[in-house]
């Protein structure tokens, strides 16, 4: 069977075939009915595949070869910071003192692990310019919600119950308005100006006594630095609102600028992005939230504190918004982030930003003659092109993304941000070499030429992948979410 026809694991099943043998029972046997109510006990055996260990290994090894990750190729997914994750991180995370402990252990038995969390919080405070950090949130959007809940608690503690609106720019990540809604706020959108930055006059019109916060990414999702950030902070603060920093793009300013110095009050970070936790497969992530002093009472509890040289969790936090996650955050990702920060140091983190920005600008300038550049100015860590020129030739941005698969690349982010027509969002990160960037650029140039000379090549792509184009509408409206085999053996 070739890679094109890889069977489902269920189709490989043969009755009586065994992949693993359990040891003999060495404890008293107990009837399942004595442990579980009848409603929870199966009436028939689960339809699990019966396959050998060798079959399993070959099956999943074959499937893994269809996957694409940072370790296998360039991954320029804009706004996702798909940088290489140093394998040193994995070695440290596997140390028994970190990997073989349990969150319910007595605090005295895990002081080393707690010291790592305490030190990591301190490093993140220094990097962001915040006064205290919680490591509880599990990922970026979770961090957003946590930060907004603290902002809500802050306003309500002051009796300011009328602050029910959160302002977001039209270039914002989709999680920003979603998090605001889940936190109980109404979202107000402000537009971008002709330079791709927040329109200051529109912001002034939007801010009023109902404003709870302005959520902002800096640099923004166009890869452009909001150069008027201090003026924006003053506008919002004078109206009694607060500034929330979406840390998705922190890779662009490490050791160069700090959100706290820009005027932000609450910050969330994506340790799985900026600080090299492996991501892209659905988790786990880590989305710590940093706050200025006035928000410390509202931090999720428990809060890790040091008393007389001993680390302990403080649960006596009457104004806390409460727990936002079981236990104390995704510890394994925090270990990896700590390892990265300590191994890089301040100068190394500064070099990260410098090289990320250099790579992005190099790519942008080389591609500008072949694709529209909606905002022709220096970018930070990422940039946005437009496929408007190709669209006039009958080639959509989606077609360009599909064609890149034939060259062995994961496509960039497409159709985001929403305020750029046929947008193509590229983030090379600092870890890619010039040779890799040039090879990707050459592929993009070839696709642009194909759109002019042989558009059907791009329109019908991909040509080399196991799965070609799917019916995306049907996949969205009538997804097949479970395996069922009919009596004749067909799917």
Curated annotation (Swiss-Prot):
The keyword Oxidoreductase applies. Its cofactor is pyridoxal 5'-phosphate. Its EC number is 1.4.4.2. CDD domains: GDC-P (cd00613). It comes from the Bacteria. GO terms for biological process: glycine decarboxylation via glycine cleavage system. One of its GO terms (molecular function) is glycine binding. Pfam families: GcvP2_C, GDC-P. It is an enzyme of class 1 (oxidoreductase). InterPro entries: GcvPB, GDC-P_C, GDC-P_N, GDC_P, PyrdxlP-dep_Trfase, PyrdxlP-dep_Trfase_major, PyrdxlP-dep_Trfase_small. Keywords: Oxidoreductase, Pyridoxal phosphate. The modification N6-(pyridoxal phosphate)lysine is found at residue 273. One of its GO terms (cellular component) is glycine cleavage complex. It catalyses: N(6)-[(R)-lipoyl]-L-lysyl-[glycine-cleavage complex H protein] + glycine + H(+) = N(6)-[(R)-S(8)-aminomethyldihydrolipoyl]-L-lysyl-[glycine-cleavage complex H protein] + CO2. The keyword Electron transport does not apply. HAMAP family: GcvPB. The glycine cleavage system catalyzes the degradation of glycine. The P protein binds the alpha-amino group of glycine through its pyridoxal phosphate cofactor; CO(2) is released and the remaining methylamine moiety is then transferred to the lipoamide cofactor of the H protein. The glycine cleavage system is composed of four proteins: P, T, L and H. In this organism, the P 'protein' is a heterodimer of two subunits. Belongs to the GcvP family. C-terminal subunit subfamily. This is Probable glycine dehydrogenase (decarboxylating) subunit 2. It comes from Bacillus velezensis (strain DSM 23117 / BGSC 10A6 / LMG 26770 / FZB42) (Bacillus amyloliquefaciens subsp. plantarum). The lineage of its organism: Bacteria, Bacillati, Bacillota, Bacilli, Bacillales. The gene is gcvPB.
